[in-house]
Design a protein with these regions (language model features):
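Generic detector of solvent-exposed, compositionally biased contiguous segments
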Residues: 7, 24-31
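C-lobe/activation-segment region of protein kinase-like
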Residues: 29-113
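An alpha-helical support segment within catalytic cores of ATP-dependent transferases
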Residues: 1-6, 99
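Catalytic-loop of the protein kinase fold
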Residues: 4-14
Length: 114
């Protein structure tokens, strides 16, 4: 919904979100702006959400559920921009090689389906 209003958060780490009764409240909004890079928001969230797990099935589930949810109201072109940019590469230092490859492969595969 935020992206549909042409806003980006700029700092979409899961730790900057509070979940309560099926609603999400965002904190740490000093990087929020209008008409920013939505692909950055998507990439940052996916990478940080995957960072702390070594259970690769859970990582796959997190990524796929996020993409499913995003596509309910978001624009699939934003996912294509993520695939066609170097955004995911920025997060390589904080991820294992396997985690990075899982993220990259899932996002690329999901984009090809559109």
């Amino acid at each position: 919904k935020i992206h549909n209003s042409d806003y980006v958060l700029g700092d979409t780490k899961p730790s900057n979100a509070i979940w309560s009764k099926n609603k999400v409240y965002f904190t740490d909004l000093e990087h929020t702006k209008q008409y920013g890079n939505k692909a950055w928001d998507i990439g940052e969230f996916i990478c940080f959400a995957s960072k702390f797990s070594f259970n690769y099935d859970i990582i796959r589930e997190i990524i796929n559920k996020f993409i499913d949810g995003y596509l309910e109201t978001g624009d699939k072109r934003d996912l294509k921009k993520l695939v066609n940019s170097n955004i995911l590469k920025i997060f390589i230092p904080m991820l294992t090689v396997k985690t990075f490859n899982i993220i990259k492969n899932i996002v690329e595969k999901r984009v090809k389906n559109y």
